[in-house]
């Protein structure tokens, strides 16, 4: 049996319009670092919850910096190439430091390594249902502890306007070429603004 907590918070992301490349850094920061700290019943007594939040904050900051550098150098195609190398390396370093698996997951993944487990898929579907009902993603977290002491933390990632350059329904030819070159099994295009892209995740081993 598992006990599952949905954690709500009051951290709100700013409304974003269509932005020039110069404003890309701040938008990515908001998309990657919108984390919550309000307690759910019993959840805050587990130090792994705070560890999960901190690890994702650090992961998001490092990934944001790498993507921003790529975007500044060569727009979306360069950012895609940088992310393909940087994201796994950053996740591996965070995982080693935390003692848990840090990364991202999505039902429509770009990298198959990020495919969700059955439990994660259920949580992602719940996030999607809540978004469709009008709830803000800023209010959502998922914390699930197994009978064996393992745990899963998820935090949703939602498509913002700037994300559409690499994940939208219409891509620039050079962007599509970069995706096709680096991701043979890409499933992460065709999104519209406001849809669930996936989630940050931390998976803790059994105790």
Where are these regions (language model features)?
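Bacterial N-terminal signal peptides that target proteins for export
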Residues: 5-28
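Bacterial N-terminal signal peptides
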Residues: 26-36
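Conserved long hydrophobic alpha-helices within structured protein cores
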Residues: 28, 169-170, 174
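Sec/Tat signal peptide C-region and signal peptidase I cleavage site
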Residues: 38-42
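Extracytoplasmic c-type cytochrome modules immediately beyond a signal peptide or single-pass transmembrane anchor
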Residues: 43-159, 174-207
């Amino acid at each position: 049996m598992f006990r599952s907590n949905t954690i709500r918070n009051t951290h709100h992301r700013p409304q974003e319009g269509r932005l020039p490349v110069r404003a890309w850094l701040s938008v990515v920061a908001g998309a990657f670092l919108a984390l919550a700290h309000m307690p759910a019943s019993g959840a805050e007594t587990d130090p792994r919850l705070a560890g999960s939040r901190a690890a994702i904050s650090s992961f998001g900051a490092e990934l944001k910096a790498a993507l921003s550098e790529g975007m500044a150098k060569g727009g979306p195609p360069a950012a895609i190439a940088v992310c393909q190398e940087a994201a796994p390396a950053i996740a591996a370093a965070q995982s080693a430091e935390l003692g848990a698996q840090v990364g991202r997951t999505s039902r429509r993944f770009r990298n198959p390594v990020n495919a969700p487990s059955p439990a994660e898929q259920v949580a992602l579907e719940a996030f999607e249902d809540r978004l469709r009902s009008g709830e803000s993603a800023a209010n959502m977290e998922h914390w699930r502890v197994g009978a064996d002491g393992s745990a899963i933390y998820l935090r949703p990632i939602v498509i913002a306007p700037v994300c559409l350059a690499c994940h939208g329904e219409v891509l620039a030819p050079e962007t599509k070429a970069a995706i096709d070159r680096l991701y043979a099994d890409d499933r992460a295009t065709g999104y519209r603004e406001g849809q669930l892209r996936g989630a940050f995740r931390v998976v803790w081993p059994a105790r």
